[in-house]
Regions:
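Glycan-processing catalytic domains of CAZymes
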Residues: 1-175
């Protein structure tokens, strides 16, 4: 992605919209990149033909923080070896500019995410490592302190962001 240009992204391209007409419309609307794109070669071909890039999901082991019930277990469920195997199997495509690493993790998983992002940087050269964290309003239930801590893995959103910055080497924060 160019730093001197505002990049406009769209989240997800549904299978029914993976037609020449839909993708052409997407490009004509000024969309530069589709985030959470599936690794569908025909759809990626259409994106490339229309000058639209993709941050692709499903290349590496996925992770979703959800309600926090799985907080702190990412390293057990997605050991770094799985990322190495995924890199060995990866088939590049001109439309792919990034690898989707996951969505809304607990800060308890940030240390492992830091290592996973390092693997992405090393094993997928030239690809953007994309990680979306919880937005500030994304606490479940009644926002009681124990619910915040369970979901974010931190006592406040400020602490959640601080932990991200300390643990995960990305040039951005996406929420």
């Amino acid at each position: 992605m160019e730093k001197n240009k505002l990049t406009i992204g769209s989240y997800y391209l549904a299978p029914y919209a993976s037609t020449p007409e839909h993708v052409r419309d997407l490009a004509q609307c000024g969309i530069d990149v589709v985030v959470n794109m599936r690794n569908d070669r025909a759809a990626l071909d259409l994106l490339a033909q229309n000058g639209v890039s993709a941050i692709v999901s499903g290349i590496i082991p996925g992770w979703f923080g959800g309600d926090g019930s799985n907080a702190g277990t990412m390293s057990e469920q997605n050991p770094l070896e799985k990322y190495e195997v995924a890199a060995e199997r990866f088939e590049d495509h001109p439309a792919i500019i990034g690898i989707d690493a996951g969505d809304e993790p607990s800060s308890l998983d940030f240390p492992h995410y830091g290592k996973a992002i390092d693997v992405i940087h090393r094993r997928f050269p030239g690809k953007f490592a994309y990680l979306n964290i919880y937005p500030s309003y994304a606490v479940k239930g009644s926002n009681m302190p124990e619910e915040i801590a369970a979901q974010l893995g931190a006592v406040s959103y400020h602490e959640y962001i601080e932990r991200y910055v300390r643990s995960v080497d990305t040039p951005y924060i996406c929420f």
